Amino acid sequence: MGSYLNPGSMLFRGSLRSKIYIDKSGLIEKINELVCTEQKYVCVSRPRRFGKSMAANMLAAYYKKDEDTKPLFDKLLISQAKSYEEHLNQYDVIRINMQQFLSETHNMEEMLSKLRNYLIMDLQEAYEKIRFREKTSLVQTMKDVFAYTGCPFIILIDEWDCLFREYQKDKEAQKKYLDFLRAWLKDQDYVGLAYMTGILPIKKYGSHSAL
């Protein structure tokens, strides 16, 4: 378990213990249909306080492979689905909140550098037996892990659009950010699912699309 790789399930457990909890686990069945398909890129655009983060926490708890979370889901709607046990606790999960990284740094370059370094640290600590080809490359590190495990990643990104909201006029920063997302996620066989949440709808920014 790392801070960003296969994080603990405490946030979802907290939701389950809440006095008011609405079972949204039916979403998992829909997402299971997309894992490792050409439709594996999902973006959920909703206003704040719409339960986007809770849903991402639920997906992280369901897919993460280093913890038995079956007791959390056995009484929920997803337990009735045919795909329930097929995907339960079967994947390496990367769970990040882009707003946290942006808030803790001073510019886009620093944000991306910190993100890369933290993810690489989690991955290389979890798979210390692997001989990594490029220890400073996030993409190559994930390729090396995938080649070793044969298990694709479930990547959950909260507040993916925060940079566009805070750097509305900085087109160069927006371009570099989209270039990073594209290089990291698009056409990579280590991606089993890329699930992103935000406020703004995905659209084309200048000559660049988000993915």
Language-model features: locations:
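Phosphate-binding site recognition
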Residues: M1-L211
